[in-house]
């Protein structure tokens, strides 16, 4: 299955290598640093529990070129070649304790940090993996989003929604560019509101999820539904690319 976290973010690829992607934070308190370390340790333990003790994990600061280089060096040392990866990296400092800043109060730094981590990271990660010959020709890239990238919604996403809109547009551009050059596919999947992830738990309220469940013709999708769609898009030699797919129980068709 896949997991989208607020801090740190993660992506899971199809070769049982899992990377935790963190953004660069300066002047951390001991308490904050301890929290980040515990988050990574918890994630690493969860991966091993679900995927086996031999699963590879690697901490990554997605904002630093030297950290990306360390990742690709690690993968090459392990002789890992990727036939695809799931990008589920996201961060937004304007959401705190289920409260979101109005758009006009978002600072340039907050906007740019969210865009860099949540959208541009797709470019920097793909470039690093291709340059190092880790990502193979004919591979599949999948990104995660939600309906708020397109419409104003009752979910508490404002700044992040803009980053997700950018991520979706980048996915389409990469479908064209990487498809022409390397036969690589790129698709995006929009998922139902979900509180089982750290991001969802930090932002959504129970009533948000319940409301979406009532509105959706099939009710909210669950993580297994999302995982099945991602695995389908990872399949070899299917000519599906540049799509924004919906795994949301039909929520997106409702007015």
Predicted segments with their positions:
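Short-chain dehydrogenase/reductase
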Residues: 1-109, 122, 126-127, 171-172, 201, ...
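A glycine/serine/threonine-rich, flexible loop-to-helix segment
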Residues: 46, 158, 181, 188-216, ...
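Residue-level signal for the nucleotide or nucleotide-sugar donor/cofactor binding architecture
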Residues: 63, 120, 220-224
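Generic structural signal for alpha-helix termini and adjacent loop/cap motifs
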Residues: 78, 128, 132, 235-237
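C-terminal substrate-recognition "lid" of short-chain dehydrogenase/reductases
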Residues: 80, 219-247, 252-253
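Hydrophobic structural elements of the Rossmann-like NAD(P)H-binding subdomain
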Residues: 86, 142, 186-189, 242, ...
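Catalytic loop of short-chain dehydrogenase/reductase
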Residues: 90-181, 190-195, 219, 251
């Amino acid at each position: 299955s896949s997991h989208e976290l607020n801090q740190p973010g993660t992506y899971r690829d199809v070769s049982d290598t899992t990377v935790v992607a963190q953004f660069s934070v300066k002047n951390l308190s001991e308490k904050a640093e301890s929290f980040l370390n515990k988050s990574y340790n918890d994630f690493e333990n969860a991966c091993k529990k679900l995927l086996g003790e031999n699963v590879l994990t690697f901490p990554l600061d997605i904002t630093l070129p030297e950290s990306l280089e360390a990742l690709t060096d690690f993968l090459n040392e392990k002789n890992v070649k990727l036939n695809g990866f799931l990008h589920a990296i996201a961060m937004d400092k304007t959401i705190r304790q289920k409260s979101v800043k109005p758009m006009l109060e978002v600072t340039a730094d907050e906007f740019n940090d969210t865009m860099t981590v949540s959208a541009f990271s797709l470019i920097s990660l793909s470039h690093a993996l291709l340059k190092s010959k880790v990502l193979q020709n004919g591979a599949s890239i999948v990104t995660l989003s939600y309906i708020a990238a397109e419409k104003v919604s009752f979910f508490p996403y404002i700044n992040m929604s803009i980053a997700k809109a950018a991520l979706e547009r980048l996915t389409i551009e990469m479908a064209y560019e990487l498809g022409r050059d390397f036969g690589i596919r790129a698709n995006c999947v929009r998922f139902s509101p979900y509180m089982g992830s750290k991001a969802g738990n930090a932002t959504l309220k129970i009533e948000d999820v319940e409301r979406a469940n009532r509105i959706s013709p099939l009710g909210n999708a669950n993580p297994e539904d999302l995982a099945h769609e991602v695995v389908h898009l990872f399949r070899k030699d299917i000519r599906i690319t540049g799509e924004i797919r919906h795994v949301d129980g039909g929520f997106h068709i409702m007015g």
